Swiss-Prot record:
Protein's gene: argG
GO cellular component, one term: cytoplasm
The EC number(s) this enzyme carries: 6.3.4.5
Localization: Cytoplasm
Stated name of the protein: Argininosuccinate synthase
Record NCBIfam families: argG (TIGR00032), PRK00509.1 (NF001770)
Assembly and interaction partners: Homotetramer.
CDD domains assigned to the protein according to its UniProt record, in alphabetical order: ASS (cd01999)
Length: 399
């Protein structure tokens, strides 16, 4: 009997490796791993999928697409979920889902499987994205169905010849892409515990960072980072280089108790050295170039966009509309930001732009001042007129 095909989002870890064996009972498994800049041994992952029973194994480099179509939205949208989390994992899920659906269409598969548990956000992100792209596709979540303990899963793996990962004893659950690294579980589950140094990988402890700062110039064109210290680079490469440079100076550590979509609170440790640096730089160029009303309104859009992406609604019309609005604001965001990296901080210390709305002759308090201070008298009268009228009415009522 010919089996149906299932497309499995494969990471090379224990959960998705066991899933191949488990799914093989009813399906021919096509394993797909997306390279979003996590730095894993992709050849090993490719071969491991075949070794444990997949009929096909695909490793797809999507770093550039991820950076240009997803990360750039987060950068230009200053998307911090709950004002702290730069949407590391949440950004990669819609792209991974899109690629899984494309491969399902190419291979004739009618089912997609993922390795998410039943208490995390990612199950929602994957399944809502897949349903948004092709409602006819069926989704299987083996880990959610098993409800096995870790010990039961290991026993199943041993009984079925699934290699046990060397890092299985690690207490942490880690997800990483070029925008950052997310870490949870183990000692981190108690929010009173300070995260130990072994919970970090991309950054040095700020107190152990170099005693001298380093400065980096970041060039932007239409809101897109295009160069570091004058060197033109693809966005993905630029982010990865900043991850290394800013990480050496302890930049980008985030300790966050967040409200998950599924209704629980979770303590997460994030490392986002490149993201934190770029977000600071981009914001400063916007501060130079956006008119006041837009600068004041845009954060409202940013907050709503952050929530939509975090909650797995990338392909929702509301998200698409907000992204379109966001893009319309970026044509004037051109210039250079100089960022000082020093012991855990990324501080913009200088900025310039040909589109700058900063007029030094208006801002200065020297003799070069061109601001007409006499105009302030009439402006204040008109601006304060509603408040004055209100006060007069209240005073009349109080008599």
């Amino acid at each position: 009997m010919v089996k149906e095909k299932v497309i499995l989002a494969y990471s090379g870890g224990l959960d998705t490796s066991v899933a191949i064996t488990w799914l093989n009972k009813d399906y021919d498994v096509i394993a797909v791993c997306m390279d979003v800049g996590e730095g894993n041994d992709l050849d090993f992952i490719h071969d491991k999928a075949l070794k444990v029973g997949a009929i096909e194994s695909h490793v797809i480099d999507v770093k550039d697409e991820f950076a240009e179509d997803y990360v750039l939205v987060a950068l230009q949208g200053h998307t911090f979920y709950e004002q702290k989390y730069p949407l590391v994992s949440a950004l990669s899920r819609p792209l991974i889902s899109k690629k899984l659906v494309e491969i399902a269409h190419k291979t004739g598969a009618t089912t997609i499987a993922h390795g998410c548990t039943g208490k995390g956000n990612d199950q929602v992100r994957f399944e809502v994205a897949i349903a948004s792209l092709d409602p006819s596709l069926k989704v299987i979540a083996p880990v959610r169905e098993w409800k096995w303990s870790r010990e039961e899963e290991i026993n199943y793996a041993k009984a079925n010849g699934v290699p046990i990962p060397a890092d299985l004893d690690s207490p942490y659950s880690v997800d990483q892409n070029l925008w950052g690294r997310a870490n949870e579980c183990g000692v981190l589950e108690n929010p009173w515990n300070e995260a130990p140094e072994d919970a970090y990988d991309l950054t040095v402890a700020p107190e152990a960072a170099p005693d001298s700062p380093v400065y980096v110039n970041i060039d932007f064109e239409a809101g897109v980072p295009v160069a570091l210290d004058g060197k033109k680079m693809k966005l993905a490469d630029l982010i990865l280089e900043l991850n290394d440079l800013a990480g050496q100076h302890g930049v980008g550590r985030i300790d966050h108790v967040e409200n998950r979509l599924v209704g629980i609170k979770s303590r997460e440790i994030y490392e986002c050295p490149g993201a934190v640096t770029l977000l600071a730089a981009h914001k400063e160029i916007e501060d130079l170039t956006l008119v006041r009303e837009l600068a004041h309104f845009k954060p409202i859009i940013e907050n709503e966009l952050s929530n939509l992406i975090y909650n797995g609604l990338w392909f929702n019309p509301a998200t698409e509309a907000l992204i379109a609005y966001l893009k319309s604001t970026q044509q004037v965001v051109n210039g250079t930001a100089k960022v000082k990296l020093y012991k855990g901080s990324a501080t913009v210390v200088a900025r310039k732009s040909d589109n700058s709305l900063y007029d030094e002759s208006l801002a200065t308090y020297t003799s070069a001042d061109t601001f007409d201070q006499d105009a302030a008298i009439g402006f204040i009268k008109l601006w304060g007129l509603p408040s004055k009228v209100h006060a007069e009415v209240q005073a009349h009522k109080d008599k």
